[in-house]
């Protein structure tokens, strides 16, 4: 079997696959309330994306509580239970190392709102339809 290394600028297929498995595992654990903390279980947290480092030792988890409120509280609670969450991940996956979990706010929805706002702008709509005037040099 040939050994190939990933030389591209983006994440490798393995990073993407492991990140998605971690995302699904964390989402299931949080959805089922398997972490025994009433403060954490009262929050409905969405795990939007997990990005893994090339060596798969660090996983950055992008999360957002339902409604977008209490983001810092959710991240603090998840960080507090990092070890227990890692334990759930290692039970579901066979990796050489259990990845260190780092929690960050998921800004995908903010970017989506900004994109929608841009597309609703009249100048942008005119450019999309081809009605804009071409710049002449």
UniProtKB/Swiss-Prot annotation:
GO terms for cellular component: cytosol. Keywords: Cytoplasm, Ribosome biogenesis. GO terms for biological process: maturation of SSU-rRNA. InterPro entries: KH_dom-like_a/b, RbfA, RbfA_dom_sf, Ribosome-bd_factorA_CS. GO terms for molecular function: ribosomal small subunit binding. Monomer. Binds 30S ribosomal subunits, but not 50S ribosomal subunits or 70S ribosomes. This is Ribosome-binding factor A. It comes from Cereibacter sphaeroides (strain ATCC 17029 / ATH 2.4.9) (Rhodobacter sphaeroides). The gene is rbfA.
């Amino acid at each position: 079997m040939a050994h190939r290394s990933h030389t591209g600028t983006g994440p490798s297929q393995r990073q993407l696959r492991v990140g998605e498995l971690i995302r699904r595992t964390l989402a299931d654990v949080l959805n089922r309330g398997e972490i025994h903390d009433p403060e954490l279980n009262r929050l409905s947290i969405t795990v939007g994306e997990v990005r893994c480092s090339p060596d798969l030792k660090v996983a950055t988890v992008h999360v957002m509580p339902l409604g977008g409120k209490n983001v810092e509280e959710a991240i603090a609670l998840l960080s507090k239970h990092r070890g227990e969450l890692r334990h759930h991940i290692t039970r579901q996956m066979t990796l050489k190392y259990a990845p260190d979990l780092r929690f960050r706010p998921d800004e995908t929805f903010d970017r989506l709102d900004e994109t929608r706002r841009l597309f609703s702008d009249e100048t942008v709509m005119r450019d999309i339809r081809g009605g804009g005037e071409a710049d002449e040099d």
